C-alpha cells in the first residue's frame, strides 16, 4: 500500500491540509490564467506552489488541491505521480536528480550516480542522515549534448558532470549550508 493510500492511526482516510490565505491567493492567481470552466488546468502550478511551501506534496496536499480546483482526488494524484518534479515524501534540502536516460548513461551518467551514492553515503532514492541531500535518478532533462547532467532542486542544471565537478558541487552545497 502506498503512502497516498495510507490512513491515520485511527484508520480514517487522509483529510485535506488546511490552505493558508497566502496559498489560496497564489492558487487564485494561477487559476485566473484560465477560463473558469478550465480551472483544472492550473493543477500543476498549484501542486508546485504547495510543494514550495511544504517541501513535498502529501496525500493530504493532493486532496486540498483537488478540493480547490473541483477535481477528483485521483486525477490530482495521477499528475503528482506522473511527473518526477513532485516530491511525494519529504526530501533533503538539496534534491539531486541525475539523468539516467540513454545519452547520459552512455556518457557517464550511471557512474556519476554511483559516485554521488558513495560520496553521500546513501542509496539511490535515499536522503543523507543530516537531511541535506536526497539523491534520485531522473528522466531526460533536455540537455543530452551536455551529458552527463543533473538537476539540483528541480531548477539548477549542472552539465558535463565529471568526478571533480561532482565533488565541487557537493562541497559547494555543503559550504552554502555551513556544513563544510
Regions found by a protein language model. Give the residues of each.
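Signature of N-terminal electron-transfer/Fe-S-associated modules in redox systems
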Residues: 1-180
Amino acid at each position: 500500500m502506498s503512502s497516498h493510500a495510507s490512513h491515520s492511526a485511527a484508520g480514517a482516510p487522509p483529510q485535506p491540509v488546511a490552505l493558508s490565505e497566502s496559498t489560496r491567493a497564489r492558487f487564485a492567481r494561477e487559476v485566473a490564467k484560465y477560463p473558469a470552466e478550465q480551472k483544472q488546468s492550473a493543477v500543476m502550478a498549484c501542486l508546485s506552489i504547495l510543494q514550495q511551501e511544504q517541501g513535498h506534496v502529501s496525500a493530504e496536499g493532493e486532496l486540498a488541491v483537488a478540493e480547490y480546483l473541483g477535481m477528483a482526488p485521483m486525477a490530482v494524484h495521477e499528475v503528482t505521480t506522473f511527473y518526477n518534479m513532485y516530491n511525494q515524501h519529504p526530501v533533503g534540502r538539496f534534491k539531486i536528480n541525475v539523468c539516467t536516460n540513454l545519452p547520459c548513461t552512455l556518457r557517464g551518467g550511471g557512474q556519476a550516480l554511483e559516485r554521488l551514492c558513495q560520496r553521500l553515503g546513501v542509496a539511490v532514492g535515499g536522503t543523507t542522515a543530516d537531511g541535506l541531500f536526497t539523491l534520485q535518478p531522473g528522466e531526460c532533462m533536455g540537455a543530452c549534448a551536455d551529458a552527463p547532467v543533473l538537476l539540483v532542486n528541480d531548477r539548477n542544471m549542472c552539465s558535463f558532470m565529471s568526478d571533480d565537478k561532482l565533488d565541487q558541487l557537493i562541497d559547494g552545497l555543503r559550504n552554502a549550508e555551513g556544513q563544510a
